[in-house]
């Protein structure tokens, strides 16, 4: 791999990490600003779930596909092909963005009525309509902006994407938090106005990101024009042929990108109905916020970290499959699954074990939040497994099954959600998500087994071993936590920080030691870990 590509990948990974970090930790001041307005988080999420789905459909995976397309033709010196697609793509993304905005804005009352099912709820249809309309403006600009990122990435120029992502998050979060503070504390406005300003921040952040990308465009344009002059001109590809190739490539990414938002949408349109059926309409808005906003933000942490590591092996799977090297392909699949489980399982388990101080640390003490986080945390393993199995299917050119497995999982979620919520309240929604994702993953695993002729014997053995290491870690953490809570309260913020730092730190050290002692880490991460183990004189 060239040093330029390694540097670019590092820059992009760093930018993505900073962006995700900011996207997680803003919820601490966000929750603090909404004290006395607990319905604010629910209202925010009611607007954001439809927006995420509309945004995914509006972009249709085109920016990522353009990145691959431009890279492919640049590699053979056909620079004009990529530029032609870029110009056309900008027009297309502008049109799809505007159309998506108009549809979302016009149909906001219908989406709101699908969400709010009872007059006893704290939040009204009118409030949800206002918030959905406020966030819909971002659709005008984000697809257009995303395509420019894709074009730069296709030229192995990751800096513009990384910098624009960070700028977008900083501006969005600053506007979001500042807007809530000004509306509630200075203007003495309503929580609806405050949350409308908060969701409109997506548009403002998008503008800032676009500004950064335009600056990069003018800075890099002389170099890009030089490449055009070197164009070989051997390939004459029509826009129809280009988009045919792009659509074939992007459809699976659309569905994978939609997986989590669609599961959340099922909750949004069924949760309040089920809660009203069992007489819990008054608390359903708060329970929804705990489920789909507060705990979900925490559950996604281990997913983001683990998939970032394991996904780096996916291109190797694609290469070995394309070249017919099945032995290398199977070894890469082994490695992908093992790294995923090695990282995700302890993170999810730690989140479940320390659910009460973690929830208090990020938000405030809440028995419902603790309960939901404890049961929801292990689902992170399923989120990560679905993303990685879907990527492997893409690597072995069987991506059509990703769509099938997701639809089956969604159907199960839709069928089971209301009955399970009636039986177990908010926990029922977590259980329905677990079942839906588990079945979707089983389908993906079966397809991998059949078409990659992959045997899961090693993974099953390794999973049991990783489970044993985690059981040992959990035992130590539970004993330590039991002792510490006699002196520290997980219901207060500062003491929760101490609990999480000590228990989490000791748990991580125990797991790290056991993985070194057993030489599991050596097998997964190679010589560098072996050298560390030797220096520490472990094993």
What kind of feature is each model-predicted range?
Residues 119-147, 365-389:
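Alpha-helical transmembrane segments of multi-pass membrane proteins
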Residues 72-89, 290-377:
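Specific pore-lining/lateral-gate transmembrane helices of multi-pass inner-membrane transport
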Residues 159, 173-216, 410-442, 449, ...:
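Membrane-interface helix-loop junctions in multi-pass transport and translocation proteins
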Residues 1-25, 80, 84, 234-257, ...:
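N-terminal membrane topogenesis motif
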Residues 101-123, 185, 348-364:
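Short membrane-interface helical motifs at transmembrane helix boundaries
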Residues 4-64, 72, 101, 105, ...:
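Signature of the first transmembrane helix
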Residues 479-539:
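Membrane-proximal transmembrane or re-entrant/amphipathic helices at the cytosolic face
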Residues 141-164, 378-406, 423:
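Membrane-interface junctions at transmembrane-helix termini in multi-pass inner-membrane proteins
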